[in-house]
C-alpha cells in the first residue's frame, strides 16, 4: 500500500501534468534519493592506481598497487613547465584525479567547458584541436601546482594524434582517444598523479624500459 504525505498546496500553485498535486510525495522516493546521494558522497577514493607522467620522455605510466600496467605516449605543454595563473605550462609534482567527465561519449566527441557540443572530430582532422573523448580533471596537492585545478589542467583526448610523443599542448596532458578511454575506465576519482621532468625509469623503480615509444614505435606498452 502506498502512503502519501498530503502537504497543502499554496493558492495558485500548479498541479502536475497528470492533474495530481505535485506535493504528494512517496516517502520511499525520498529514501532512495538520500541513499543514492549518501553512496555518491562516501565513495572511496582510488588508492589502487597511480599515474606517473614524464614530460622529459612524453610518456605516461599507469601503476596498479605499484606494478606497471601500461605505458602510453602523451603530449604535454609546448610552452614549458610550471603552474603560474594564466600560463599554458604543464605543472609538476603530486596531483590527483579530481573529476571524470565524458564516460559515455564516443571517440572524438568534442567538449567545451567540460560539456559535450554534439560534434565528433575524427583523429588527425586538419585544422582541428579541441578537447575530445574523455577528461580527467586534475587537482594539485602541492604549492607548486596549487593552480592546476583552476587552470583546467586535464588528461584528455586530442584529435592531433600525430603530435603525440612530443610537447604540443597548452598545459594539459594529451592522449590518443583509444588510450584515454582505456585509462579513464581503469582509474577512479582520487587516483594519484605524479608529473616529473625525469625519465620514467627514474620516477618508477623497476620499470621495464626495453620498450621504446619513439615516433617509429608509438604503440602503448601494456602489461597484463
Place the predicted regions along the sequence by residue.
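Post-signal peptide N-terminal segment of mature Sec-exported envelope proteins
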Residues: 48-73
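Electropositive
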Residues: 69, 73-105
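Exported/periplasmic cell-wall-interacting domains
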Residues: 84-89, 105-224
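Sec-dependent signal peptide recognition
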Residues: 27-33
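Bacterial signal peptide processing site
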Residues: 43-45
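N-terminal secretory signal peptides that target proteins for export/translocation
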Residues: 1-25
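C-terminal motif of bacterial Sec signal peptides marking the signal peptidase cleavage site
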Residues: 39-41
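Well-ordered beta-strand positions in beta-sheet-rich domains
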Residues: 50, 71-73, 94, 152, ...
Amino acid at each position: 500500500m502506498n502512503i502519501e504525505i498530503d502537504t497543502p498546496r499554496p493558492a495558485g500553485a500548479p498541479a502536475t501534468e497528470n492533474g495530481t498535486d505535485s506535493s504528494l510525495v512517496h516517502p520511499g522516493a525520498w529514501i532512495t534519493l538520500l541513499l543514492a546521494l549518501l553512496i555518491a558522497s562516501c565513495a572511496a577514493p582510488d588508492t589502487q592506481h597511480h599515474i606517473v607522467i614524464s614530460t622529459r620522455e612524453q610518456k605516461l605510466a599507469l601503476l596498479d598497487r605499484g606494478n606497471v600496467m601500461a605505458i602510453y605516449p602523451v603530449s604535454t605543454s609546448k610552452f614549458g613547465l610550471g603552474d603560474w595563473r594564466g600560463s599554458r605550462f604543464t605543472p609538476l609534482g603530486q596531483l590527483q584525479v579530481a573529476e571524470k567527465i565524458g564516460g559515455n561519449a564516443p571517440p572524438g566527441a568534442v567538449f567545451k567547458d567540460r560539456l559535450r557540443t554534439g560534434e565528433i572530430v575524427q583523429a588527425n582532422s586538419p585544422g582541428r584541436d579541441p578537447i575530445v573523448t574523455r577528461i580527467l580533471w586534475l587537482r594539485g596537492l602541492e604549492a607548486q601546482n596549487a593552480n592546476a585545478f583552476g587552470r583546467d589542467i586535464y588528461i584528455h583526448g586530442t584529435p592531433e594524434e600525430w603530435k603525440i610523443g612530443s610537447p604540443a599542448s597548452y598545459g594539459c596532458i594529451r592522449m590518443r582517444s583509444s588510450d584515454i578511454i582505456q585509462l579513464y575506465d581503469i582509474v577512479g576519482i582520487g587516483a594519484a598523479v605524479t608529473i616529473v621532468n625525469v625519465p620514467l625509469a627514474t620516477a618508477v623503480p623497476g620499470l621495464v624500459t626495453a620498450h621504446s615509444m619513439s615516433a617509429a614505435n608509438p604503440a602503448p606498452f601494456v602489461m597484463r
